[in-house]
């Protein structure tokens, strides 16, 4: 089940009884044991669902095209991949075939913490910088996981808001922690927040 932008799964403790009112965005309900059910809720209907054999699911799209997560990727492997990418690092961070699990919010935060301009070409990063990228990605994702994620707009897991949004340094912020004005630009059609002072472009 690729959840896409705002899809979510909610595990409901009590099974729906006759006459109960469902959310209008509950599209699929899985009836589980012990009076439990799992509801698939998707406000904008971006998500997808496909029934596959358990032994073959990793060979199905889009899973078969996903790269490793930051927690498991070897930085030298990532370095070799980035050497072939003459694209902005912000765009490459969102390419799930290279490294999976980094969305737009976290890509912005990773670039800021590294003092890395989002327009920087991925293929100019040194091995040390790529190692730093992996370390920073893991650090930020771990913090977000511990805080229950980042609740922006309509998404919350299990009906509970995450708390990492209060720790965001640049994404949807007006000023960075040092007080500099944040600039918002579009890179490959994705909203990109960065600090032109802290993340100066290399010349």
Predicted feature locations:
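A short, charged helix-loop
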Residues: 46-87
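Short, surface-exposed beta-strand-loop junctions and turns on beta-sheet-rich folds
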Residues: 13, 45-47, 201
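A residue-level signal for conserved active-site and pocket-lining positions in enzyme catalytic cores
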Residues: 12, 30, 41, 103, ...
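Single conserved hydrophobic/aromatic residue that forms the stacking wall/gate
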Residues: 1-7, 12
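Short histidine-centered catalytic/ligand-binding loop motif
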Residues: 19, 62-71, 120-127
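Basic, nucleic-acid-binding surfaces and adjacent catalytic neighborhoods in DNA/RNA-processing proteins
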Residues: 80-203
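A gly/proline- and charged-residue-enriched helix-loop-helix capping module
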Residues: 18-19, 23-28, 36
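Structured, non-catalytic alpha/beta "coupling" segments that mediate domain-domain communication
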Residues: 29-52, 147-151
């Amino acid at each position: 089940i690729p959840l896409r932008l705002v899809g979510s799964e909610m595990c409901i403790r009590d099974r729906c009884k006759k006459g109960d009112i469902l959310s209008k965005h509950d599209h699929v309900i899985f009836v589980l044991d012990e009076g439990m059910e799992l509801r698939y809720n998707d406000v904008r209907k971006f998500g997808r669902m496909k029934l596959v054999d358990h032994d073959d699911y990793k060979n199905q799209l889009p899973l078969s095209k996903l790269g490793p997560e930051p927690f498991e990727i070897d930085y030298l492997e990532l370095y070799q991949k980035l050497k072939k990418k003459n694209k902005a690092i912000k765009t490459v961070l969102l390419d799930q075939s290279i490294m999976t699990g980094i969305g737009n919010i976290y890509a912005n935060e990773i670039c800021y913490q590294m003092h890395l301009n989002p327009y920087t070409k991925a293929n100019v990063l040194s091995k040390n910088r790529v190692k730093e990228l992996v370390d920073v990605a893991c650090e930020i994702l771990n913090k977000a996981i511990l805080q229950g994620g980042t609740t922006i707009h309509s998404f919350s897991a299990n009906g509970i808001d995450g708390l990492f949004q209060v720790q965001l340094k640049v994404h949807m912020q007006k000023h960075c922690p040092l007080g500099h004005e944040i600039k918002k630009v579009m890179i490959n059609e994705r909203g990109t927040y960065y600090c032109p002072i802290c993340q100066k472009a290399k010349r």
